[in-house]
Structures are given as structure tokens and as C-alpha cells.
Regions:
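Conserved alpha/beta-domain cores
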Residues: 92, 519, 529-877
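Extended, non-globular alpha-helical segments
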Residues: 396-436, 487-525
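Nucleotide/phosphate-binding sheet-loop regions of phosphoryl- and nucleotidyl-transfer enzymes
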Residues: 1-391, 418, 424-427, 434-439, ...
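Short beta->alpha connector loops at strand-helix junctions that form conserved
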Residues: 40, 450-452, 471-474, 562, ...
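Flexible inter-domain linker/hinge segments
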Residues: 210, 379-411, 525-531, 535-540, ...
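Glycine-rich phosphate/ribose-binding loops and adjacent secondary-structure elements
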Residues: 332-334, 431-442, 446, 454-460, ...
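Structural motif
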Residues: 240, 410, 427-429, 448, ...
Length: 877
């Protein structure tokens, strides 16, 4: 019989694939002797089985779970569902990768009217009675919300109404009698919403709760988070069942969340929050704003001293910063969870360097422990120092996720999406965020919440996304119904500007200028380590000297893609280019192109100068001509006048350029075949610029790489290459200099990959244009795929957007085939990638595996690619 259930005493940290992260760490803490309430874990395989069985828990799994309950009863001396000495449990999810706020928790399971009455009868203390009713109403509320999907808001409204009637501000101020009434109201609300009574049998409660955790693996929030974080659907989640310890028992109890180092800065100091007389959910959900962890020392000196020891033990054991949840019940400490803590990119770099300096990690291990995707956030804007000095903060919350944000106020995630789609920059202002808000949080420049601490949902999710966040600004008076809030006497309506500083927590009215980030010393240190290990070169996609300069600062070793068409759109050149398009004869076309030549030459010269002898790959004209022609009446008239043609004639030419499927139309090398004069002009510009820069800097190795786009047949490449080589050689001879250059091609049509052995005979290099290669392989266009991709995610046909994360099974197979066919024919062939995928870590890893020479990505993703390339090389060892 298969083992579906493991006691905490039966597992360890190596079993996270089976027990999930939380279960494996609870087992590990048990094995090193830390105070963990002893329970059991239902495996991730049971979750997969649940889905295979049509979303049902089979009898075998349930029977093993009940055996686990019996073991818990033995260890704890209490009985599940017993009236005299009841065992109450918590049910929590735990996937193998941490997914904050995505999966749901149920506390105090096992309570019903009889158990509650018996518990109170056995202990006449009024404080105990209050505790029992508090635990009961929490259980009904959580069970209804998480297991039965009755919205939390119905219960929150009842609590708010009760507090109003009693004239109190906090839940803790409600009496036992108030909470007893609330529990009755909650059960009535449950029946009203679902048409059946609240389940009173603890075994039924447990089964429903386990099913709910498994079910939540497939909730929309979990699916979005998984897609953003490369977590496969097939992993499933485990379920952890453990005896309750009560932080809300009395004033000798409490609950907290802590980090062994500061998750925002990485500084080596204990950082966290503690709430007296509360349950864990209160801290994480951010309903009450807690006190800093250091204050716990005054309240519970013995438990605090033990906790400090536990922190040291865990950090020395895991060799990484730990995020821990704990409860104190009657002054006794219990550990409920530990995991490697989520951290900002700044903190990740500092912690990695410190762990190397402290002897916990090697350089290679330090490089491997940083998530490359988070490096993006280091390059985030900060407020301009002078503008900041002149501004006065209106209020202050907690600086929960660094960076500076400025935008228009919106009050719901839906509004954030609508406004952002119109190109507006928005700041999402909420009482507190919940996992349902994730889509709005993703598009916002920043997030501001009234409630919640540094470990609330808003804070954790914002840090993960690299979005600026200020949480827990209790001075804000919120009026969600009318979409406005008041702070320091000033009213902010939807659409008003606000600026927030996620580092200091300051909130400002109006707009404050932001500036690009400065990169700290640890960044350079970690990047130097990464460069030591990686084998892949990293280039950038850049069309302007400014982009190229930025990319060089971030460590780019060349330009892997310069798109020449962007240079045609500038005011002074577009007119000449339009004349070329509307010309009738080769001579007319050549005359128009002659006007553009000096501009192109100047552009290339500036790029060569910015790269100081590092390689520059220049892609010849790619888009279809209709993209360049005028659409406005005035522009059409201007063009007609310049060419001495009638407006009618010009309009006819424009109409003739219309294509039904321009993506597969008259573009790329097809333009150079029909209009070789375009390729001639571009070649002259490339070679003349190179000669000029070579003369000025004889110590640089200026070697142009000319790239012919959209080749699908070797004869096309031969034809265009002949034009390029004849033109280039004539230019070099005329100048009386020596200059080496290369002619290569983009591999972006499946047929090019399939016939790469033929094409390699004519090409000096291949560069995979994976944006087009993905479109052509899947047969859907990048601009239209958005209409149906969401349905594909919902139905699990796709788990990822193939335009963001390289499809390794299909597109990847074509790439591998092209390399295997091309290299034997032309051993000198060098191969790169220049689609958007060049900056995606999992795609970079794949490129390393199949033997590419370089990846090329946008300037700000260069550090991501450098780190991902190093991690791929380290993992291979």
C-alpha cells in the first residue's frame, strides 16, 4: 500500500518534493529538536491523486489521515472530537515552492457547539470562555471562506456591526458574550448563503478542509502566481495537519512572524512582528498592526530568549536567512513554520555576500541562491534627491517594498487594470490587499494599504514582484464606496496624483520626480562571481547609443541585435524613406536612399563608438513597407508635393502596399530581393561607419556583423549576400583599408531551422529570432494571442506564455536541430539568440544546454541573463 501520510518525525528537509516545503521543514525542525507541535503531512502525490480521481479524496488517503490523527492523539494526550479533552487542529497547505497568500489555512478545526459548551463547563474562568468563543467564531469564518467559498466580507460586516454597537475599536475589546452572539450570527449567515447547516462532525470538517487545500492548488490566484514564477501545475501541494497551539488563549500568549535578517535590506538583525493575545492569521492578514519583535522581550522574556536561540540554530542549519512563524501559549514557545525567507533583490545580494564572508556559502553557492528575475528591481527608480528635499510627507506607513512610485490613485484592482490599459500610471490604495487583488497589483506603479505590517499580503507580494509598497498607514481615513480617502486633512479622489516611497514609508501629495537607480557594491561583487562561472556571452538588443551605453554599464559584451528600421522613423529621414517607397524607378529609389545614407552611417558610427570594439550585429530592414507610409491627410499631401505626384497616385501606392497578413508578407530579406538597392545602401552605411571608427581607433577591433532577416531558403541568402559582399568589398577597396566583416542570418522561420545545414554553408553566424520563430512554429501571432491565451491557461493547455518563456519542446527542438545541422557544415559558425527570451532565466538555461555562444536581451535584463547563464553553468557541474 502506498504511503500517503508522514508524521513530522518520519521526514526531513530532503523530502520537499513529497512533503512540500512547509512539511519538509516541520519534519527537519522536529529532527533537530526544536519545539514543534507534532502532526503529520499528507503528500503532494495525494494531491495529484485527488485530481486524477475527479477531485475526490479516496478512502485509502482518508484512512491514513485518520491514523495520523490517532498518532497525534497519543502524542498530545487529547482526543479529536472529544468533549472532555478535545484535540483541535490546523490544516495548512504547503507546496514545494513557497507561494505566499496563494493557498489557504484553516485554524481551530474540531470545534462544534457541544465541544465549545464542554470546554467552557470544564474551565469557569471568564477569560477562557472568551478565548473559546473567539476561536469558534474564527473557525466558522475561516471554514466558510476557505472551504465553502462564502466570502469573508459577510463575516467582516457582522464583526464591524458588532463593534459599532458595542462602541469598541478592536476585535480584542469584544466580550465572551459578544463573541458567542457572533458565532451564532456566523452559523446563520453560513446557512443563509449555502442552504445547509454548518458541519458539526470533526471528521467531516477535516475531510472537507483537506479537499479545500487540494482544490486551492487550482484556484485562479495560484495559477497566476505559478505562471509568473515557473512553478509547474503537476507538482501539487501537500497538506499539513497539526495540533493547535493558541496565541489567543490569554495575555500570556501571542503570535509572531520573524526573519533572521532584514528582508528589505539584508542587514544581519532579527526583524519581525508580534501580537499579544492573537492567532497567526492576525499578523499575516494585516488586520491589526502588530508590535516590533524586540518588544516581545519585555512581554515574554523566557520565550524570547529561547526564540533567539532557535533563530541561530535555524540559520546555522539552513545557511540562509529564515522566515519563521511561531506562537507563544502560556509563555511557552512553539515553532509553526520556517523557510528560506523571501527578500528584495538588494537584500538577496547583501545576504549572499555576507554568507560568503561568514563562511556559510561558497561563491558558486552564493551565485546559485539569487533569483535572477529579482535583479530587475535593483534597477528601479528612486525619487530625485532635490525634489524629495523640497517635498513634505503628508503621512507615513511602513516601507514594505523598496522603490519610488508616483501615479494616479485607484481603489480597486479592476480599476487599476482599466486605467493601466489606457497608459495611465496608477497607485493602488486599499484598506488591505488580498490575493484576489494580484492582477491590479501587477500593473500598479505602487501599492498603499491602510492596514497590515511588513509581513502582510501586500508587503510579501509587492516585494516578490519588485513593486514599491507602503503598508499599514493607519492615519488614512478610507471611503471606498465614494472612491476617496483623507490623509492629514487632505482629500484624495480617484485620479488624483500621489507619490509613495517604499523604502522610507513616506507618502506625498502630487507628483515627485523619479530618477534611475544606482547600483550598490554587492551587485558588482556577485556579478563578478557570476562572470567567473558562466560560459555564455551576454549581448544586448539596442538601437541607440544611449541604450548601448546603459547595457555596457550593466555588463553587456556587444550588441546582438540592432534593428535598423527604428532609425528610419525619425523626422528627418522618414520623408526620404517614404519617397523611396513611392518611387517608380530604380534611379528614383536610389536617389531617395542616397539622402538617408549619411544618417544611417552616423547612427552606426555612434553605435560602434559606444561599443569600443565589441561586436555589433546589425539587422537589415525587416518590417513591411506599409508600416512606413503616411496615414494622415496632411502627410500624404506633403509627400505628393515632394515627389511631384498627385495625391491620388500616392494614395494608390499606399493602398497597393496593404497586405492581408503582413507578418508573413513582403518583409525581411524579401524586401532586399525585390529592392536590392535598400541592402546596398545599408551595406555602404555599415562599412563606411566601420572604416571611419577603425581609423579613429586603430586599437579597437571593429568587425561589423551584418544580419539578413527572415531567410527561409538558402538561395535567398545567397542572393542578398552577393549584393552585400560586392558592395562592401568595393567600399573597402575604394577606401584602401583592411576591414573584416561577417554576413549571417536570423533563424526565425521553421524551414530555416530544418534546412540549417544548407544555410550554414553561406552564413558566418546564426541568430535565433525567437519572437518570430515562436509565432511561426505555433501559427499564432503575438499581437492576437492575448485574445485566447487566458482560456489556454484556464484549461491547462498552456502553463506559460510562449512569447515570455521559450517553448523548449517545440521551438527549442528546432533551435537544437539548427545547431546540430549547421555546426558540422561550418565549424566556425557562431550562434546566438536575440528574441525577448534572451532575458528569461529558464530560456537562458536552455540556451546554455544546447550550446549557444551568446544570448542577447534588452539592456535592463543584461544582469538577469549574466546571472542565469552562471547558474546554468554551476548547475551543470
Amino acid at each position: 500500500m502506498k504511503k500517503w501520510v508522514y508524521l513530522f518525525s518520519e521526514g526531513d528537509m530532503t523530502m520537499r518534493n513529497l512533503l512540500g516545503g512547509k512539511g519538509a521543514n516541520l519534519a527537519e525542525m522536529t529532527s533537530i529538536g526544536l519545539p514543534v507541535p507534532q502532526g503529520f503531512t499528507i503528500t503532494t502525490e495525494a494531491c495529484t491523486q485527488y485530481y486524477e480521481d475527479g477531485r475526490k479524496i479516496n478512502d485509502e488517503i482518508m484512512a491514513q489521515a485518520m491514523e495520523g490523527v490517532a498518532e497525534m492523539e497519543k502524542i498530545n494526550g487529547k482526543k479529536f472530537g472529544d468533549l472532555k479533552n478535545p484535540l483541535l487542529v490546523s490544516v495548512r497547505s504547503g507546496a514545494r515552492a513557497s507561494m505566499p497568500g496563494m493557498m489557504d489555512t484553516i485554524l481551530n478545526l474540531g470545534l462544534n457547539d457541544e465541544v465549545v459548551a464542554a470546554m467552557i463547563a470544564g474551565n469557569p474562568d471568564p477569560a477562557f470562555e472568551r478565548f473559546v468563543y473567539d476561536s469558534y467564531r474564527r473557525f466558522i469564518q475561516m471554514f466558510s471562506d476557505v472551504v465553502m467559498e462564502v466570502g469573508k466580507k459577510y463575516f467582516e460586516q457582522l464583526i464591524d456591526k458588532m463593534k459599532e454597537e458595542k462602541g469598541v475599536k478592536y476585535d480584542v475589546d469584544l466580550t465572551a458574550a459578544d463573541l458567542k452572539v457572533l458565532a451564532e450570527q456566523f452559523k446563520a449567515e453560513y446557512k443563509n448563503q449555502l442552504g445547509k447547516d454548518f458541519p458539526s462532525d470533526p471528521v467531516e470538517q477535516l475531510k472537507l478542509a483537506i479537499e479545500a487545500v487540494f482544490r486551492s492548488w487550482d484556484n485562479p490566484r495560484a495559477n497566476v502566481y505559478r505562471r509568473d514564477n515557473d512553478i509547474p501545475y503537476s507538482w501539487g501541494t501537500a497538506v499539513n495537519v497539526m495540533p493547535m497551539v493558541f496565541g489567543n488563549l490569554n495575555n500570556e500568549s501571542g503570535t509572531g512572524v520573524a526573519f533572521t535578517r532584514d528582508p528589505a535590506t539584508g542587514e544581519k538583525k532579527l526583524m519581525g512582528e508580534f501580537l499579544k493575545n492573537a492567532q497567526g492569521e492576525d499578523v499575516v492578514a494585516g488586520v491589526r498592526t502588530p508590535m516590533p519583535i524586540a518588544q516581545m522581550e519585555q512581554e515574554f522574556p523566557e520565550a524570547y530568549a529561547e526564540f533567539i536561540k532557535v533563530c541561530e540554530t535555524l540559520e546555522n542549519h539552513y545557511h540562509d536567512m529564515q522566515d519563521m512563524e511561531f506562537t507563544v501559549e502560556n509563555k511557552k514557545l512553539y515553532m509553526l513554520q520556517c523557510r528560506n525567507g523571501k527578500r528584495t533583490a538588494q537584500a538577496a545580494l547583501k545576504i549572499a555576500c555576507d554568507l560568503v564572508d561568514e563562511g556559510h556559502k561558497t561563491e558558486a553557492e552564493a551565485v546559485a541562491m539569487i533569483d535572477p528575475r529579482n535583479l530587475d528591481t535593483l534597477l528601479h527608480p528612486q525619487f530625485d534627491a532635490a525634489a524629495l528635499k523640497a517635498a513634505t510627507p503628508l503621512g507615513k506607513g511602513l516601507g514594505a517594498s523598496p522603490g519610488a512610485a508616483c501615479g494616479k490613485v485607484v481603489f480597486t484592482a479592476e480599476d487599476a487594470e482599466v486605467w493601466a490599459a489606457k497608459g495611465e500610471k496608477v497607485v493602488l490604495v486599499r484598506l488591505e490587499t488580498s490575493p484576489e487583488d494580484i492582477t491590479g497589483m501587477k500593473v500598479a506603479q505602487g501599492i498603499l494599504t491602510v492596514r497590515g505590517g511588513m509581513t502582510s499580503h501586500a508587503a510579501v507580494v509587492a516585494r516578490g514582484m519588485g513593486t514599491c509598497c507602503v503598508s499599514g498607514c493607519g492615519e488614512i481615513a478610507m471611503d471606498e464606496a465614494n472612491k476617496k480617502f483623507t490623509l492629514a486633512g487632505q482629500v484624495f479622489n480617484e485620479g488624483d496624483y500621489i507619490s509613495i516611497d517604499g523604502t522610507t514609508g513616506n507618502i506625498y501629495a502630487g507628483q515627485i520626480k523619479t530618477v534611475d537607480a544606482q547600483i550598490a557594491g554587492e551587485f558588482g561583487r556577485v556579478m563578478a562571481w557570476a562572470d567567473k562561472y558562466r560560459k555564455l556571452k551576454v549581448r544586448t538588443n539596442a538601437d541607440t547609443p544611449a541604450d548601448a551605453k546603459k547595457a555596457r554599464e550593466l555588463g553587456a559584451e556587444g550588441i546582438g541585435l540592432c534593428r535598423t528600421e527604428h532609425m528610419f522613423f525619425e523626422e528627418d529621414r522618414i520623408a526620404a524613406f517614404r519617397e523611396m517607397i513611392c518611387s517608380d524607378t530604380v534611379e528614383e529609389r536610389e536617389a531617395a536612399l542616397e539622402k538617408i545614407l549619411p544618417y544611417q552611417q552616423g547612427d552606426f558610427k555612434a553605435l560602434y563608438e559606444a561599443l569600443e570594439g565589441n561586436p555589433v550585429t546589425i539587422r537589415f530592414l525587416d518590417p513591411p513597407l506599409h508600416e512606413f507610409v503616411p496615414t494622415e491627410e496632411a502627410d500624404i499631401e506633403k509627400l505628393a508635393k515632394a515627389q511631384g505626384k498627385s495625391v491620388e497616385t500616392i494614395k494608390n501606392i499606399i493602398a497597393s502596399l496593404h497586405e492581408f497578413n503582413p507578418m508573413m508578407g513582403h518583409r525581411g530579406c524579401r524586401l532586399a530581393v525585390t529592392y536590392p538597392e535598400i541592402a546596398k545602401m545599408q551595406t555602404k552605411a555599415v562599412i563606411r561607419a566601420a572604416i571611419e571608427v577603425q581609423k579613429a581607433h586603430p586599437d579597437w577591433n571593429v568587425k561589423p556583423e551584418i544580419m539578413i532577416p527572415l531567410v527561409c531558403e538558402v538561395k535567398e541568402l545567397k542572393f542578398v549576400k552577393k549584393v552585400v559582399v560586392e558592395t562592401a568589398d568595393a567600399e573597402i577597396a575604394a577606401a584602401g583599408v583592411k576591414l573584416e566583416y561577417e554576413v549571417g542570418t536570423m533563424i526565425e522561420i521553421p524551414r530555416a531551422a530544418l534546412t540549417a545545414d544548407e544555410i550554414a554553408k553561406e552564413a558566418d553566424f546564426f541568430c535565433f529570432g525567437t519572437n518570430d520563430l515562436t509565432q511561426m512554429t505555433f501559427g499564432f501571432s503575438r499581437d492576437d494571442a492575448g485574445k485566447f491565451l487566458n482560456a489556454y491557461y484556464d484549461t491547462k493547455i498552456f502553463e506559460n506564455d510562449p512569447f515570455a518563456k521559450l517553448d523548449q519542446t517545440g521551438v527549442g527542438k528546432l533551435m537544437e536541430m539548427a545547431i546540430k545541422l549547421g555546426k558540422p557544415v561550418n565549424p566556425k559558425l557562431h550562434v546566438g539568440i536575440c528574441g525577448e527570451h534572451g532575458g528569461d532565466p529558464s530560456s537562458v538555461e536552455f540556451c546554455h544546454k544546447i550550446g549557444l555562444d551568446y544570448v542577447s536581451c534588452s539592456p535592463f535584463r543584461v544582469p538577469i541573463a549574466r546571472l542565469a547563464a552562471a547558474q546554468a553553468a554551476i548547475a551543470e557541474k
